[in-house]
Structures are given as structure tokens and as C-alpha cells.
């Protein structure tokens, strides 16, 4: 995971391999523009089981173009960049302070050395393969600059150490399990904000209806209490007891953007509230539910922490039962009105022609919750489609609440699901529509624009599986169906 300053733990899953023929001990994310150079790869010791940071030291022999007139450094750098002679390596700055000393002893750390004498001149690191003592390795551009006495090519040793080598996101396969504790230490080193590194020992939800997982601690404390920030909201929970996936942050934001102030939303499988709580901040009335008792507790605490309790009401029920329960209670209950006060900006108060405004004026808005839902959100991809039969006859005998009798439309349903990862998107859409139709008892097809149908790919879960979101208007034939 990549929750740099928020989620205080890191996890490793076990579905995808490291790059072929590489050791997990030495995998690095640094890339060289000219090629994937072995010179910049980390040293390899496949026998290492306990992390030895001192082992990861390496001297890379390069060359540097020392510039005689530092006023011309910009133009010379541009020339070398255009001729592809400049070293372009991730995290390494090519502009260095030139140093006095024997030609063979000009050395600097990858991050730039802070000790030693400097003569005020600068040098530019040159790409791998250019040798100071071999003119045949020089490009025409370098030869021209040397002949013009603009630069001097000198040897330059670049020191790499443990701090230089970073890592790419990886999944831990069985053949790398002997390295798991060593990898845990490396991950903690490379993510200073991380308190704990874990390895998932089974698939999410394989042993729990609450989409949790078993894990082992690879480094740090066995403490899974985390704090996450998303969409200006704060969530605190035990990561081992609820489902959370930061990679869905964009999807959370996209869905919440569909909700409008004053609308009513039924979040059937709400979790800790990544849809519900940001919606509450938008002054959307949310009936939020989660089957997990601990998830429900976190949802309630999150609503209080983010000051949206007036708009977000948490429940702990089975999702199918909740669809009917929430619909009935919303219709039969007394209309809920929230008085929302917004502070008038100082500039607006001062510029207002109405001088009767007090120094600290507030605008007051009254928001009344509708008696029917505008949206149903069902975020349980593995099984959410199976709950769609709860919408059969949901508004039976209540036609007068909707168009054409009023300006209210039947609700939009947003159901998340998995499907196979196919090169033919039409097959994916057809499969999802068939599954939805079976549970609704009403045929929906990919071409059914009248239902405001949208089937959108959310993310690739594995090489063979995708996550989708299907949104459609609840058909009147389903909503008003009599038993």
C-alpha cells in the first residue's frame, strides 16, 4: 500500500511475481534513461536472511564534463541533454561541484558530498559508456566542447549505498518467503512513516464475510490501528477488522461527486464510510449500513469525528433487509430537517450594501430530507448483484410518489461487481447485464439507454478479473411489481 502519511502500516500480498530472474533483496525502482543498466542495480546476495545494510554499497565508474566557465553551464547542459550524453538516472542530480584531486580519485556520493574542497566550478555527469581516457567513446558534441576548451572530461566515481536503492510495488510469491522478514525491514526503512509491515496469508474475504484477512507481521509492532485521510475526511480503525483499499480513493471520489446537496442516499454496504462520510460533508442525507459490527462502530465514530452526524445515520443489518428497512422508514418517518448555518466571508460582509449585518454574520439554510432515495450504493463486488432481488416491489402501490405524478425519479442503483478480464468489452458488459437481469427479474441489456445504464471498469484486480460499477435507473416494472 502507499499510504505515505496516513495509513501507518504496509502490506504485501501474494499473487504476482518479482521481475523475472531478480532477487527480491535487490529489486530497485531506479531507472536509467539510456538503458536498464546493471551498473545501477543493487548488489546481490541471495544467501542473506538478516538485513545487512552495509552490503548495499557500490561504486559506479563514470565520467564528468568539468565546465571552465560556470556562466555557460545552462547552454552546455542543454547540448549534452540533446546529444543524449548527460546522465539521466532517477534520484541522481547530474550537476555537481567539480573537485580538485588526482584524476582517479574524483569521487562523490549519489546525493552529493558535503565535505572536501571545491574550486567553484561545476561538472556534469555523463552517461555510462563515456570514458575520460578513451576519445573513441566521446560523441561529436563532447569532442566539440573539449576542442573549444569549454569542458574537460575527467573520471568520476559515484558512490551508491543502501539509501539510494528504492523498491517497486511487489507481491510476495512462495519462492521469496525465505526473504520475507528481510523485505519487511527494507520496506520500513524506505517508508519512514510506516510503523508495521504485514504479509497477507490468505485472500481478502476467504475466511470472513466481513472481507477481512489473516496476516503475519514482518516488521514493526503487531498494532493494526491506523488513521486514513481521504476526501478531507479522517477515518480511524483496526485494519485487520475491516476492509479498506486506498487504491479505490478515486472511485470513492467519483461516486460521491454524483450526489447533490439535499439528496438521500442509501449506502447498503458502507464499511467505515468512504462514500457516506464525504457525502455527509456535501450535506447529503445518508442512510449507511454495514453488517460488520466493528465496521458499524467505526462508521458511527467517523460520522462524529467528521461532524456529519446530522446527515449520516449508521445501521448494523443484513444488506438485503436494510434496503427494505431504510426505504420504509424514510417514507413513513417524519421528514428530517437540518438547519445549516454558513459563516458569511468577511469580504462579503464588508462589501454588502446591507449594513445591518453583524460583524459575524451567518447565512441559514434549511435542508429537508426527501421521502424517497435518490441513490442506492452497493459496494460488495463479490456478491452485491445477488442483493438486487430486494428491489422487486420495493415501491409497490407507491407510484404517486414518482414521475409523472411528481418531479421525483425512481432511484439510481450503483452496484459493484467482478467480471472476467476480457479483451472484448462487449462480452464483459453482456455478462454483467445478464446477472443483473436475473436478480431483478427484468431484462436489462447493454444497449438499454432508457435505463440510464452505465457499466464502467473500476480497476484490474488480477490478470483474469476486473472490478466494475454498473449504474442504472431502477425500472418501474421492478419497483412497482406486486407480490
Swiss-Prot record:
Catalysed transformations (reactions): guanosine(37) in tRNA + S-adenosyl-L-methionine = N(1)-methylguanosine(37) in tRNA + S-adenosyl-L-homocysteine + H(+)
Listed SUPFAM superfamilies: S-adenosyl-L-methionine-dependent methyltransferases
Subcellular location: Mitochondrion matrix; Nucleus; Cytoplasm
Region (Disordered): 1-24
Bias (Low complexity) ranges: 9-24
Keywords: Cytoplasm, Methyltransferase, Mitochondrion, Nucleus, S-adenosyl-L-methionine, Transferase, tRNA processing
EC numbers, comma separated: 2.1.1.228
One GO CC term on file: mitochondrial matrix
UniProt GO BP: mitochondrial tRNA methylation; tRNA N1-guanine methylation
An example Gene Ontology molecular-function term: tRNA (guanine(37)-N1)-methyltransferase activity
Residues at which S-adenosyl-L-methionine binds: 252, 290-291, 379
ATP-binding keyword on record: no
Record keyword Thylakoid present: no
InterPro entries per UniProt: MeTrfase_TRM5/TYW2, SAM-dependent_MTases_sf, TRM5-TYW2-like_MTfase, TRM5/TYW2-like_N, tRNA_Gua_MeTrfase_euk
Similarity section: Belongs to the class I-like SAM-binding methyltransferase superfamily. TRM5/TYW2 family.
UniProt subunit comment: Monomer.
Annotated function: Specifically methylates the N1 position of guanosine-37 in various cytoplasmic and mitochondrial tRNAs. Methylation is not dependent on the nature of the nucleoside 5' of the target nucleoside. This is the first step in the biosynthesis of wybutosine (yW), a modified base adjacent to the anticodon of tRNAs and required for accurate decoding.
HAMAP family cross-referenced by the UniProt entry: TRM5
Name of the protein in its database record: tRNA (guanine(37)-N(1))-methyltransferase
Taxonomic lineage: Eukaryota, Fungi, Dikarya, Ascomycota, Pezizomycotina
Amino acid at each position: 500500500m502507499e499510504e505515505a502519511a496516513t495509513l501507518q502500516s504496509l502490506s504485501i500480498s501474494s499473487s504476482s511475481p518479482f521481475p523475472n530472474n531478480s532477487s527480491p533483496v535487490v529489486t530497485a525502482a531506479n531507472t536509467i534513461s539510456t538503458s536498464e543498466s546493471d551498473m545501477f542495480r543493487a548488489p546481490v546476495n541471495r544467501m542473506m536472511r538478516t538485513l545487512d545494510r552495509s552490503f548495499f554499497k557500490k561504486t559506479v565508474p563514470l565520467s564528468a564534463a568539468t565546465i571552465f566557465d560556470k556562466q555557460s553551464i545552462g547552454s552546455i547542459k542543454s547540448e549534452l541533454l540533446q546529444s543524449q550524453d548527460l546522465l539521466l538516472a532517477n534520484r541522481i542530480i547530474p550537476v555537481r561541484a567539480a573537485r580538485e584531486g588526482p584524476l582517479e580519485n574524483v569521487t562523490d556520493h549519489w546525493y552529493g558530498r558535503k565535505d572536501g574542497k571545491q574550486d567553484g566550478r561545476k561538472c556534469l555527469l555523463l552517461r555510462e559508456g563515456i570514458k575520460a581516457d578513451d576519445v573513441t567513446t566521446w560523441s561529436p558534441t563532447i569532442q566539440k566542447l573539449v576542442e573549444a576548451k569549454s569542458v574537460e572530461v575527467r573520471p568520476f566515481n559515484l558512490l551508491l549505498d543502501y539509501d539510494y536503492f528504492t523498491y517497486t510495488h511487489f507481491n510476495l510469491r512462495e519462492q521469496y518467503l525465505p526473504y520475507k522478514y528481510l523485505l519487511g525491514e527494507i520496506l520500513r526503512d524506505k517508508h519512514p512513516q510506516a510503523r508495521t509491515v504485514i504479509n497477507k496469508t490468505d485472500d481478502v474475504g476467504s475466511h470472513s464475510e466481513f472481507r477481512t484477512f489473516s496476516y503475519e507481521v514482518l516488521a514493526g509492532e503487531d498494532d493494526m490501528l491506523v488513521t486514513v485521510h481521504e476526501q478531507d475526511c479522517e477515518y480511524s480503525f483496526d485494519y485487520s477488522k475491516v476492509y479498506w483499499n486506498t487504491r479505490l480513493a478515486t472511485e470513492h471520489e467519483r461516486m460521491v461527486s454524483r450526489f447533490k446537496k439535499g439528496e438521500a442516499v442509501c449506502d447498503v454496504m458502507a464499511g467505515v464510510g468512504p462514500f457516506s462520510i464525504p457525502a455527509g460533508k456535501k450535506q447529503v442525507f445518508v442512510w449507511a449500513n454495514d453488517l460488520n459490527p466493528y465496521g458499524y462502530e467505526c462508521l458511527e465514530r467517523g460520522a462524529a469525528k467528521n461532524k456529519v452526524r446530522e446527515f449520516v445515520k449508521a445501521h448494523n443489518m443484513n444488506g438485503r433487509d436494510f434496503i427494505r428497512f431504510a426505504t420504509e422508514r424514510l417514507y413513513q418517518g417524519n421528514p428530517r430537517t437540518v438547519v445549516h448555518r454558513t459563516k458569511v466571508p468577511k469580504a462579503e460582509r464588508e462589501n454588502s450594501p446591507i449594513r445591518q449585518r453583524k460583524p459575524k454574520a451567518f447565512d441559514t439554510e434549511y435542508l429537508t430530507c426527501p421521502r424517497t432515495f435518490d441513490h442506492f450504493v452497493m459496494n460488495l463486488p463479490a456478491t452485491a448483484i445477488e442483493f438486487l432481488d430486494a428491489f422487486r416491489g420495493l415501491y409497490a402501490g407507491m407510484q404517486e410518489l414518482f414521475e409523472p405524478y411528481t418531479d421525483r425519479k425512481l432511484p439510481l442503483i450503483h452496484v459493484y461487481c467482478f467480471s472476467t478480464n476480457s479483451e472484448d468489452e462487449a462480452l464483459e458488459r453482456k455478462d454483467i447485464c445478464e446477472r443483473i437481469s436475473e436478480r431483478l427479474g427484468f431484462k436489462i441489456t447493454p444497449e438499454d439507454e432508457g435505463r440510464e445504464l452505465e457499466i464502467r471498469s473500476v480497476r484490474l484486480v488480477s490478470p483474469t478479473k476486473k472490478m466494475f460499477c454498473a449504474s442504472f435507473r431502477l425500472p418501474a416494472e421492478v419497483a412497482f411489481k406486486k407480490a
